């Protein structure tokens, strides 16, 4: 199993089946015996995609004619993983992210799904300015949710409880990836 395929299966297990990401990731790493580089890529792809679900789902909502909840779980996992690579992994060439996503959609879905994935991912590259996060002044809850990877309901609760300034501080704190010992 290649790295992207392993990440795809992990995302399906977590997002569709409700598995715990840390357990899924540990099992895959033990089973697959990835090289150090592949292990780091796999881990970033899974955890990064999960951390960025708000933003990648926001993009899907803007670009897709279909509602996110009506998409096949295979299609949704492939799109999320592809969009994460396009928008957050600067060392992954866009062509590789798109092509590999299409291969996954074709292998685990069908040709129609592969075409849909290809169209949405390539469209996201052409329409980056349309996909900009609303400013804080336009929509503070959506801005903080997408920027700092927190759920909107939680942002609303924090703003009510602590005010906007302290909410920004909380968002920054909880989005910080801890340093390794």
List where the protein language model places each region.
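Class I Rossmann-like S-adenosyl-L-methionine
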Residues: 1-181
